[in-house]
């Protein structure tokens, strides 16, 4: 089957936003107008096409990123609808990794909200061009220009309107196009009858002012346009559009549009903007990767002629076809039934069938081309972030950064029958979601699951019950602490056992130093002259890694430590890998005496919105919870407080805030960083853990 749409006519976009800004409804409308669905499903009625899991329909939030394909103006648009709830950050992150552009949806009453900041920051990290859609213009309190100002104030984004609303709230009836300088007036409820008219007289001055601002902002990103602008020459609409496209693709400019997805206004114009301003796979730099045979960096330009290279970005268990692997093709062509190499794992995989997904319905296809997003059936060893390539042209593409889980729960099966099923269920769920970890406590035999927040674990336990029919008792949530060293030290690990027959002998000197936050564990071999033979070096590293899984103070995993093996000795007969593993773990224990070990706790960025009269209460809440206020701003009659607070102090805060503000206060929290716990708290944690052991 030949390629249906050329690469220039392909767009891979994500729809991202804060929870409840109307992302899924916006996606629904896109599918309606592009002819993918014939009846619109409302999220708040639990009938949305994209929210296809039972829990999503019950909770009215999007949990997994459903991928779908639509067509608009002779272009193919692959859309990924991502969740806005902070506990599902990995879904957003893995979508951004494989997208070329994104639509950020704002609630035009609230503007930029906490999770908008998180997804915006992630999109900036991945260099994803964005357009902004200020949604819910029909809502009471909708304020388009306020929303635009929050993009400047909270995100420091060079964002400018390319549209203005005509009316707002119940009176929202049309949109001014600042490029054509025309008004689009909606005359029916489905948003399909649109009249293009001259701009109403009462809006003309404002439209001219914002058109001028737009031209100036775009000219600042392009020298040729700047010269024309300064010399007073007219910049044509075509030049303006080309300038916006170039600056948007270079992530220097963010066009802002407005509308109401629920009231069917502005979505088609937003689709036009996706085509006009967001990049095709040809507009973005070629993907880079490492050739595993040479360790050299290589690129794969977006072209069907190049060797096949793709990134698996999501694993999903489908009740009808089994394990689905979603992947983005960066270069080359892939046919069903062919073999590929998973270069991340060094395993050969057979592509059974290839499916084009539409939320949770599917269409089987024979071939995928560069720039496509599809799902494959039949891959056994592939997990999130793995590279799939042509066997003759290996490359490992940059993987997906997986955030560390911050919260854990103990789960135990209710019956013997549940016990066997629980292991399989947890393994399948962990395959789908890399931020979900499953561990068994060696000493107690308990199963501990960790994730990004209470809702995250709640949904997974719920899925275990519904999809895998496993009943389990769940313990209270616990904080995932970490341990580290705060000082440098040198330590010896010496292990010798001789009791008849072959003995054991391992001797190492290791220098331990604190590493930068987030860098994890780094091992350096500085042995000179073979005092520790080469074949035992990996055993030393392995011994350290295994020991660091249970830290020296309270048994929490150790992070951000550098270890340099610089000296040691061995025995010709008695030295073995086991002996050197044990020696390394003894060196770590010895180092703990002088390396100032510390316990780290997850700090959350908490954003609390309360009526003005409750501001004093909230400041008291933050202080009482060992938090520190980072900033405050007024919004209407409310105050928004941003603060850093330890996760350990936030359990049950929803109830406290509700009673203090008579149910009018809300809060959101996002994991921000790890920080040393105060000495008094550290002693309590150690005591508690010793008591439990």
From Swiss-Prot:
Name this polypeptide is given: Elongation factor G
Entry keyword set: Cytoplasm, Elongation factor, GTP-binding, Nucleotide-binding, Protein biosynthesis
CDD domains named in the record: EF-G, EFG_III, EFG_mtEFG1_IV, EFG_mtEFG_C, EFG_mtEFG_II
Record family assignment: Belongs to the TRAFAC class translation factor GTPase superfamily. Classic translation factor GTPase family. EF-G/EF-2 subfamily.
Domain tr-type G: 8-282
HAMAP family, A to Z: EF_G_EF_2_B
Pfam families in the record: EF-G_D2, EFG_C, EFG_III, EFG_IV, GTP_EFTU
Binding residue positions for GTP: 17-24, 81-85, 135-138
Entry's Gene Ontology BP terms: ribosome disassembly
Main localization category: cytoplasm
UniProt key word GTP-binding: yes
Cellular component, GO annotation: cytoplasm
SMART domains named among the record's database cross-references: EFG_C, EFG_IV
Keyword presence, rRNA processing: no
Coiled-coil annotated residue ranges, if any: none
Function according to Swiss-Prot or TrEMBL: Catalyzes the GTP-dependent ribosomal translocation step during translation elongation. During this step, the ribosome changes from the pre-translocational (PRE) to the post-translocational (POST) state as the newly formed A-site-bound peptidyl-tRNA and P-site-bound deacylated tRNA move to the P and E sites, respectively. Catalyzes the coordinated movement of the two tRNA molecules, the mRNA and conformational changes in the ribosome.
Subcellular location as annotated: Cytoplasm
